[in-house]
Structure formats: C-alpha cells, structure tokens
Amino acid sequence: MEQFEAINVEQAYSRWKDGSAALVDIRDPQSFEAGHTPGAFHLTNASLQTFMQQNDFERPVMVMCYHGNSSRSAAQYLLHQGFDAVYSIDGGFEAWARQYPQDVETSA
C-alpha cells in the first residue's frame, strides 16, 4: 500500500471489534481523556516511538482524529514509517461517538 485508504466508521468498527487492525487516536490529550474508543492507542509525537516498537508493521493501523481530516496526513506518515496498511477513518471520533456511543470510554 503506497497510499492510505479512507474507511467509514462502520468499516472501522468491524475491524476494531474483530481485532484485525490497531486503532490509534491522534486527538489532543484533553479530548482523548474526555472520550475515546476502548483500546485505542493515544498517538502523539511523544508516543510514536513506543507505538512503533509495540506494533507489528504488518498489522493494519486505523487512524482516528476529530472529523477525519488530520488523520489523513497521520495515516500517510505511518505508511512512510513502514507500516504495510494504514487507514484514515472518515468522520473521525465525532462520527464514531455518534454511531457507537456505547463504545466510548473516558480516562477520568
């Protein structure tokens, strides 16, 4: 995969539920703490190396942001770091929380 692929929240939810892809959330710390998908890795500049060390580059990665815009550049960046398949979630966390409110947790 040379270019990331955009997927909708239904596709992302299915992959998240069956565990076939890693989920990273690139929103700011306050937004992440206020609500995020269970098991999502909070990916920041500071946590990037940890994520890369802990994850198999052959396992698909889904990138979530606020609305599905910022995730596109982050997805492309992860591809350039060597991940085989990276997906940007259209609609981002806002769409996820609207469609799957039961699958949102807080850090508080």
From Swiss-Prot:
PROSITE patterns for the chain: RHODANESE_3
Keyword vocabulary terms for this entry: Cytoplasm, Transferase
Enzyme Commission number(s) from the entry: 2.8.1.1
Superkingdom of origin: Bacteria
Annotated catalytic residues: C65
Tagged with keyword Flavoprotein: no
Protein's UniProt keywords contain Cytoplasm: yes
Reaction(s) the record says it catalyses: thiosulfate + hydrogen cyanide = thiocyanate + sulfite + 2 H(+); thiosulfate + [thioredoxin]-dithiol = [thioredoxin]-disulfide + hydrogen sulfide + sulfite + 2 H(+)
Annotated GO CC locations: cytoplasm
Residue intervals of the Rhodanese domain: 17-105
Main location: cytoplasm
MF terms (GO), sorted A to Z: thiosulfate-cyanide sulfurtransferase activity
Broad class of enzyme this protein falls into: transferase
NCBIfam families referenced in this protein's UniProt entry, alphabetically: PRK00162.1
Protein's recorded name: Thiosulfate sulfurtransferase GlpE
Taxonomic placement: Bacteria, Pseudomonadati, Pseudomonadota, Gammaproteobacteria, Enterobacterales
